[in-house]
Amino acid sequence: MSVYLLHLASTHAHFHLPELETLAKIENVEFWLIPKSEYLNVAFKSDKSRNQALFSHAIKEFQDSISPNDATTQNPFMLAVVNSNEDARRWIRRSIFCKGIYEIYCIGDSFTRLHEKMKELNPAPWDSFKHNSSYKFTFETFGTRRTMKEQLSIISDFEYMQLQGPVSMHNPQHVFTVLENRRNNVEGPKVYFGHWCGSGSRDAIDTFDLKQRSYIGITSFDAELSLVTAQMAMAAPGKLIYDPFVGTGSFLYTCSFFGAHTLGSDIDGRQMRGKNGRSIKSNFRQYKLSPFFLDTFTGDVTNCPLRKNLLLDAIVCDPPYGVRAGAKKIAKCSQRPPKESSSTGNHYPKLEQYQISDMVYDIICFASDRLVDGGRLVLWLPTITEEYGIDDIPSHPYLSLIYNSIQPFTHWSRRLLTFQRLPRAHDSKSLNLLPKINNKTPSHHNFREKYFSSAGRASASTKFSPVLE
């Protein structure tokens, strides 16, 4: 077991821990977070029971460091205990928020103290490869930047390491990294030194950048959060993932990027089909992910044509809020169908308005029927900040809410809810009709009207459309 430092992005901090825990489950990696109070004490790294006891403290500490206004963190460095370098690499290799992971050699509140502690290491962790292996030094700073002159001066102070191998800036065998948090208001250690183990997949954000996508619409979802949605769905090879509000397919691309097979549906087939040769299919060709795309169909989540015994590994969706796109469903027909259907020509079902609170209820009921045991429903839900309460979160006896991550705006928020299907062996045979979200009206009821109310207009300056974010 060793202590590792995670260098995280400073934005969307509410999503960091859920992603890390989900990736650990996907890769079957065991880890423990370390609270700041223990950062200068790495002697406990092999004490498994103590690590577990400190885990909850570290989580609370990280959550308290998140700004409530913009969901940023003042300290993007997090320490964790992991079993091996290989586990550390596998753990964060597909992470969207983790820039890199480093095996930590020393931590100090200043460079002077760092060097003192480094010289006390016996044996030094780099002794086994200091003679013949190529290497280089890199810097990661938060809060400011180091000039090249400053970097060279700091590197020269590590001469006591007596590294005798050649320097290789392009293909080194070992990378030593100095990480520094130079924010004045940050308490605790300011300087970290370690050995680079691996990087995340933040370059995927550029891959799926909406500005580079051939076909988008007004509901196309931000690339970074689309990738996180796929992470929370545990998208991976061999998985089948469905989006019942597919729109222009943002979630399908990112789920397929991680190897899952995807399909989607929407009440309005025009967005899926596109025009002038640009469509969901053309985007799959652009990303070279066509083998993972099954198909799309025009349909309604309340009248889904998928066969009942088709179980899904995950359902991902961003239901229409009624702001950029209206929510509709197929209306019940009060008339009998004509006897001779051939004489009627094409038939288009009548649609009616769909209240978002009713839609959410239908989604979780659908998910409880169609998910495999342990499958996930990953759902984006808008909430009004001043009215938000625990009753806003939908519940179902067969689904367990495991994550509730928030993206705050001015007067409203967008929450990423992650539910997990409980084992069917424990299903109640007497369950008939579920109460609609605890029999209380959630704050997202009539969300459109609230959004465009006086409070809503004040927040309209906040970029709403994921296309513009």
UniProtKB/Swiss-Prot annotation:
Origin superkingdom: Eukaryota
GO biological process, alphabetically ordered: tRNA N2-guanine methylation
Signal peptide: none
Subcellular compartments: Cytoplasm; Nucleus
Gene Ontology terms: cellular component: cytoplasm; cytosol; nucleus; tRNA (m2G10) methyltransferase complex
Main subcellular localisation: cytoplasm
Pfam families, per the entry: UPF0020
UniProt keyword terms in alphabetical order: Cytoplasm, Methyltransferase, Nucleus, RNA-binding, S-adenosyl-L-methionine, Transferase, tRNA processing, tRNA-binding
Subunit structure: Interacts with trm112.
Function recorded in the entry: Catalytic subunit of an S-adenosyl-L-methionine-dependent tRNA methyltransferase complex that mediates the methylation of the guanosine nucleotide at position 10 (m2G10) in tRNAs.
PANTHER family linked: RNA METHYLASE-RELATED (PTHR13370), TRNA (GUANINE(10)-N2)-METHYLTRANSFERASE HOMOLOG (PTHR13370:SF3)
Protein name: tRNA (guanine(10)-N(2))-methyltransferase
Organism annotation: Schizosaccharomyces pombe (strain 972 / ATCC 24843)
